[in-house]
Amino acid sequence: MYMARCGPKNNVLCFPFQLSFLFSKRLINKRFKYTLQTEDEKDMMGSLSKNKIITPEDVEFKLAQLREFSNTLKERIHNTKSVNSDGHQSNSIAPISEDSRNVNVTKISSVPNEEKSKNLSDLIHSSFLEKMDHLVPKVIRERVADDDILAKNLFDRSHSNWAPVIDRLYVSEKRFMDIDSREFSVWLNGTVKYLPFHSILHLDEMLLEQINGDVVKFNTHMYECIFNNLGNLKPTNFNQDGTNDKVILKMKELLERYDKALKITEERINKKEGFPSKVPKMTQAILNNCLKYSTKCSSFHDMDYFITKFRDDYGITPNKQNLTTVIQFYSRKEMTKQAWNTFDTMKFLSTKHFPDICTYNTMLRICEKERNFPKALDLFQEIQDHNIKPTTNTYIMMARVLASSSSNAVVSEGKSDSLRLLGWKYLHELEDKNLYRHKKDDLNLFLAMMALAAFDGDIELSRALYYLFIAKKYKTLCANWKGNILVDQDTIWKSTLMPEMLNYLMLAYARFDPRNLPVLSGYEKGIELRRKFLREFDSSMRLDDTDKLVKFKLPFLPISDLNSEAQVLAESNAIWSFNLENGGTRNTLTSSNEAALEDIKKYRQLLDSFAQEAEDFNEFKFKVMYEVTKMQRESINVNVFNKISLHTYLSIPINLKQQKEFLRRLTFFTFQQHEFEAVIKRLYEGYRNIPSSHTRDQNSISTEAISVSKPETTEDLNLIMHDIWYITCLRHKIMMDTTLYELVMKAAIEFQNEDLAKKVWNDRGKFRTTVPFLKMDQRIRIAKDQKFAHLMVEFFTKQGKYSDAIAIILSSKNRFNWTYSMVRNLHKALEEIEDRNSVEILLDVVNKKSHAKALKWEEQELNM
């Protein structure tokens, strides 16, 4: 294969474009013939022993390559409107005459540089004008009056930015005046997209100015353009619920403008002033943009408003796309009942509304959340019955539904292994069909395989999948990175590490059992797939040690098979710390005594300034919480450090029955709200020198709210330093919530630790008085309290303290809906000791409880 290197060089003659083609072709012919002659001579001299000569077929093949190259070059010149020296345009390449072949190069070299430069400039300019005519109308280009802005923001259509163009038009003299509104609006609607909010306002103002404020002339294309740009916006972080959202308000203002136009049109008709040539109409696309933005705001009220408005006032009912958007909104809001109702409505409305594969994929995602594998299997059968073509995501979602359903023996109906096996078979079917894969499908496919492997407790495969995916993503980012890779390691790792992948890997560690065999090892296709990933993992581990260009390393133990609990705990700690410290680019979880003292000194001064500047305790508390959040973002990878991954990480030592390690992890990575408030209050009173209203109890724990005056004693100074260090350590801690309290109670049940059970009972009681708990929905509070009470009953049952378990049930029978499944273990234990009286009391509570009474009791408690 022969390659030609192209590019600008110094001290090289410059020729007009067509002549350059003539000489380059002649030069290529000469070089090609010379190459063939040279190769022929070499072959004749060096391959006599091999009896190898160049055949006519080889020559013909190489000539065909040359002809293809020449034709390609001709095509490029044909498509470029080059200007010749006589000022005539030519759209084709003239035949090469004999005179042209014998051009004297020395004469050409004497052509003035100015003429050559002019020819090249004319060529570039004509090409620019041709492309610009396809992007913007001529009148728009004239009023922008800056070709640099147009070229910079519009030439790359994949990253076009219309905001500078619209803003430049806004400050121009004529704006959109004296432009035919119909043709212009058609171009506008199909071209101008993804404007920021201020540019949308400018565009709307110019369009109104173009039609002299006559809203009747504000046509459908104009409405669709404005609504399309509004629908593509993202809500601000501080206004996720859509309350008084400026975009929603603008949408409603546009609808009011449309209503006004209809009213004016009707009045003109009644007065016989003439019927307008074309009345604007609302469309399904406009409704969809309204719904799209409403779902981004998670605003059910606004979504319902737009649906009702379009249906009642404009006669536009939601179509398939609108209803799919509504279902996706319900899915994000965990409103599964409403999603199923809407889905059923789509199936029975009409054939035009019948769900497509996008809608079915959304419903499969809901099945995953509900762990409802029977419904998922029914949906997949419906897809096949209605001849709907499944996508890659359909098979992936089926695998994920089956994986999540296999996590619980009750949900899986005792067939966890069978569900995981079926999930793998869906992925095998996906591989056999070789369907189109979107860029995001690779991630979803890895997540599905990680889910199946993690719930199966297959640590080897989970490690391999995690390593291969993270390595691929890291190296891809480095290969395309425009900055300094070594300097930007923090940013690269933040983009590489993923919380979902980490959570599944931690889940695999938590389900470790050396006695279990992976389901993939039970059939030939599964064995081949598993071996393939393990081989790639092993070879990648070895190659990455010698890769000097892109250094990549994950803190896995240098062994292929983890076979002990100590190894699992060690590796899970290493991977967890590696993720939190953002690929090892930060040093947050470990610090020397000197560094700790420096932090205490630094934050002592900072907290002192907060206390002096704050008007009251609440402002001081807000400043401290803001500083803690800022400190956490600077020192921890907050993308992977969340309550879900922490819950899975803490469950590892529970399942492995390692009590000491569980308590260490719990203490190091969590804090409690009431402890935090006590420390904050102590610091505030100490800095402000406020006398305490409470005397310090010698037997009280350090977390009790006490006042600190001037630190005159060593004990007071140590307490101040302890509190400051407590605040400093919050950068790697997450506040305990109801879910984590439930996990601690499960740990107390597993370890049979009565002291831990009493402590978590008291701590949760204090948590119930804090603002985070009181802000929860009333029904959620009841459900969380009931679940914790159920865990307490399980603890006392396992301890053999049946009277205490029954006491909890009786004391809460008016609040909770006690079902038999919640007291099954207690009932069996009472039957074994033949305590008929307690059994009768227990069954009476289970059979006569009313949930309505529980809500009424909760309401009375809140009133009190």
UniProtKB/Swiss-Prot annotation:
Q: Which residues form a coiled coil?
A: none
The UniProt entry, under PROSITE patterns, shows:
PPR (PS51375)
Report the locations given in the UniProt record.
Answer: Mitochondrion
Transit peptide as UniProt keyword: yes
Any one GO BP annotation for this protein? mitochondria-nucleus signaling pathway
PPR repeat boundaries on the chain: 319-353, 356-390
Source domain of life: Eukaryota
Q: What's any one GO cellular component for it?
A: mitochondrion
List the transmembrane segments: none
Q: Which InterPro entries match?
A: Pentatricopeptide_rpt, TPR-like_helical_dom_sf
Assembly and partners?
A: Binds to mitochondrial small subunit 15S rRNA.
- Role according to the record: Regulates mitochondrial small subunit maturation by controlling 15S rRNA 5'-end processing. Localizes to the 5' precursor of the 15S rRNA in a position that is subsequently occupied by mS47 in the mature yeast mtSSU. Uses structure and sequence-specific RNA recognition, binding to a single-stranded region of the precursor and specifically recognizing bases -6 to -1. The exchange of Ccm1 for mS47 is coupled to the irreversible removal of precursor rRNA that is accompanied by conformational changes of the mitoribosomal proteins uS5m and mS26.
- Other notes on this protein? Involved in mitochondrial-nuclear incompatibility, a major determinant in reproductive isolation between species, through hybrid incompatibility of Ccm1 and its interacting partner 15S rRNA between yeast species.
Would you identify the family this protein belongs to, as annotated?
Belongs to the CCM1 family.
Q: What is this protein called?
A: Mitochondrial 15S rRNA processing factor CCM1
Organism field = Saccharomyces cerevisiae (strain JAY291) (Baker's yeast)
Q: Give the source lineage, highest ranks first.
A: Eukaryota, Fungi, Dikarya, Ascomycota, Saccharomycotina
**Which gene carries the instructions for this protein?**
CCM1
